[in-house]
Amino acid sequence: MTRRSPLLRIAGLLLILSGLLLNHRALGAALATDEEVTRPLALVAILLMQAVLALAGLWLLLRPPRGPVPAFVGAPLLLALAGVTGFGAWAEARYREWVQPRIRQLPELCECWSKRPESFPGAAKLTWATANLKRAEATSKDSVDTVEWKTMLGDFLLRDGQNDKATQILQQALESAKARSMPVHRINQIRRWLGVANMRVGEVQHCIRMHGAESCLFPISKNAVWQNKTGAFKAMEYFRQFLQDEPGDPSVRWMLNVANMIAGTYPEGVPPSDLIPPSVYASSEPTPRFREIASSLGIAPVQLAGGAIVDDFDNDGFLDIVVSTFDPCTPLSYFHNDGNGSFSDWTAKAGLEEQTGGFNIGQTDFNNDGLLDIYVKRGAWLRTSGRMRDSLLRQNPDGTFTDVTDESGLGAYAYPDISAEWADYDNDGDLDLYVGGEMLTDTKWSPSQLFRNNGDGTFTEVARQAGVLNMRNVKGIAWGDYDNDGDQDLYVSNLGQPNRLYRNNGDRTFTDVGPELGVAEIPPFNRTFATWFFDANNDGWLDIYVGGYAYLGGTGLPDISLVAADYLGMPTNAETLHVFLNDGTGHFHDASERMNLNHVRAPMGANYGDIDNDGYPDIYLATGGPAFDLLVPNILYRNIGGEYFSDVTTAANVGHLQKGHGVAFGDIDNDGDQDIYVQMGGIYRSDVTASALFENPGTSNHWLTVKLVGVKSNRPGVGARIKLIVNEHGKPREIHAVGGSGGSFGSNSFQQEIGVGAAECIEEIEVWWPASGIRQKFQNLPVDKFIQVTEGAPDYRILERKAIKLRGEGPSGREPRPQAALFGAPGGTRPPGPRPPGAQGG
């Protein structure tokens, strides 16, 4: 009887195994540049290949025996099949993240984008549209396809900073569309883009190159109108023509009104049917009027989007500023507060010149040495190209920083991230780190990571064991003890998927209770961004803020259409801002409508502070969408007695029209009120903007600034709870604060700057340190003081802090501090890349 060859059996098994392993997900992870196979033809081919391999394997296993296979045939066959199977196993392991892909080091992305400019966000589409336009023109100069490609190319040229060329090609598209008698709606879309292009030309000249303190603040004042109004008048004409054919379009109405503002013809120059009256955006509450002084202080880097920290890095009693930018060739900027009303650039002195890029940054003290360290978050929005490592920068006693990412164990992983936050989740006295993973492909997400601090300068990644992998597209992270049980819970804001509320079980594990507590779903599309825990109504229970992010998709409308429609009272199908109030039993209810936050504003960066020292947290939102037509103001909401929020943007003079990202509150001049620093800039390589510092003029309300010093707990007191009892107008009230840096996109000072309203004495302050369980109470404290509370100490200490007058020039302003030039940046420029010898960084 002829026996079946064992070689054929093994070959059959290997073929079947190869058929299973070589699926489209594994092959995409192994071979595709974006780690995903999406073309239908390729998907069909892979499925057919899998079927052939599996059927061939079954045939070899089941075919009748026909004698032995010669070794010189069987051995090479088995080796080949083993190689194919091994490749399939490796590809599958890579897809499932069992094999970590190569991590990009800091200089790599800069070098890549310098040599291959098409790698920059939006640049590849410019090349693609140019090639398609050439193909369309080869057939006909005025075909419908040619018009479509010219319109699309105009948009991509704007993103690239080629504004004049964009205007020229859009004008050609308009003439061709008219000649072909294309539908009015299609002609109007070209007019709309021509209006945007003409406004962009003026925006670059007046808001960036000739930047002044009020040149970009909404509503544009008569003192800030453009000197060269040509672009504004051209834009008005296109917008008026659009509205004659399609009256009522919210985005075009909005842009027509803004164009009139910047030309100095608002409101009289706007047709009555299209006028957006000042009452639409006017403030109804009295509010201190800020002045923007960043440029005159030399702390306004002209950059792409990035993060910001306001804190005292050298422990001299004055708050410094650290800024990052998405540009992979520009280093962090460290502006030292000199204590005399001016700032010095300490970037080089602190050894930060090699720390380039960073969509977001935050401060920490991971080793409890009393020196603030910096964590840099990288790779956001870049999907698989964003597998570059973050950086943990340890501050040394001499004020320099050392990159300890690898030696700490944080450098072993790299996923794109925009949000990472610190807290002592296991109450062992040191700060742990949660890093939110982003989308890698259309169907694949990065795991989020929880790094437990080992107390010796190293970390262990424990997300899977703790139950917080998330596997969604994270855009915001917040730690806070929502149930007042003494341990830190975790809220995760996911873009396009339900959010998570991970309850800390007290045993180093978490349970997602978001759905049952009603804080997971944000209708209609679960698109949210920045988030935080705060006590919005001072009842001693932490509430949740999470900002809806209305972007292109879902409704099919661009950002400005949604935001403008909301301003005009028109219905929108988009996410609004949300606040979930804690009812004191650990449950939440959506109070967004009652508190007047149910509006579409599309913020990325956001944070909270107390601008009027009334003891209730206010909110500043930085509108950060990528589109050039998103000329909507950043927003300041004042908290009115914990009952509702009032939009006081125009009264406060803080409605910057350029794209905002990192937002940081802090008392920069030590005068007792919180100033606001906003990192400005977009994501497309020409969309650079000067950052802003809004100086608070103050009110008559009183305040207390508390510096926490942990002993058994983490040194900066992150997560510690502060309760003040004051008597205001003859009535006792409580004011609550929590140690930390505020929201998830921008970092406030760790010192707690607490307003106490009209109270002239603080009857009692209580500080609760959850890690140790220590509760300290002190009575009869003076107001308008800086104090230090050290964990376990018998008394507090008054700190001597000198108030200073910032040397800003107010409305006049001056030129922004020069920065390393960016791709297509205005003002004559160098693309990102290695700097010439002797060149100074950011």
Positions of PLM-derived features:
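Short coil/linker segments at helix-helix boundaries
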Residues: 172-188, 196-241, 265-286, 560-563, ...
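Blade-edge motifs of beta-propeller repeat domains
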Residues: 268-303, 335-356, 391-415, 447, ...
